[in-house]
């Protein structure tokens, strides 16, 4: 996908990362300070396997070992990673870029993001009535 210039953007409101506090994983949501959505650099691929067409995408990340904000996420012993955010003024460039030029936009996310502890929501208990109406 990289060498075929199959660049994509994934619009997001929040991304989730784990922050390890006292050895325990805590789920955090990361958003822009202004609450606006943002776009993550991605690659896409469409392949035919037998008679089936398979579509896939991957978000791009970059090393964040020295990133002042992203350094807090992932296990302490693991490499720190940051998604690559494509700013609005570069979105069209990213989609039309040649892979040899794309490295200039592969940077860790910039300033202007906040993290909030967001525990995973608990699943509601199923009742017989819910099963009847929800299949």
Report each predicted region and the residues it spans.
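A structured binding-face within diverse protein domains that lines the active/interaction site
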Residues: 1-135
């Amino acid at each position: 996908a990289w060498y075929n210039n199959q660049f994509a953007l994934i619009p997001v409101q929040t991304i989730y990362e784990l922050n390890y506090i006292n050895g325990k994983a805590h789920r955090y949501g990361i958003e822009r300070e202004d609450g606006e959505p943002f776009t993550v650099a991605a690659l896409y691929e469409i392949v035919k396997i037998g008679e089936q067409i398979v579509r896939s995408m991957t978000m791009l990340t970059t090393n964040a070992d020295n990133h002042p904000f992203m350094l807090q996420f992932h296990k302490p012993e693991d490499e720190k990673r940051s998604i690559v955010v494509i700013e609005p003024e570069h979105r069209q460039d990213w989609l039309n870029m040649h892979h040899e030029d794309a490295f200039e936009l592969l940077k860790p996310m910039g300033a202007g993001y906040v993290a909030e502890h967001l525990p995973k929501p608990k699943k509601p208990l199923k009742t017989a009535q819910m099963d009847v109406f929800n299949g």
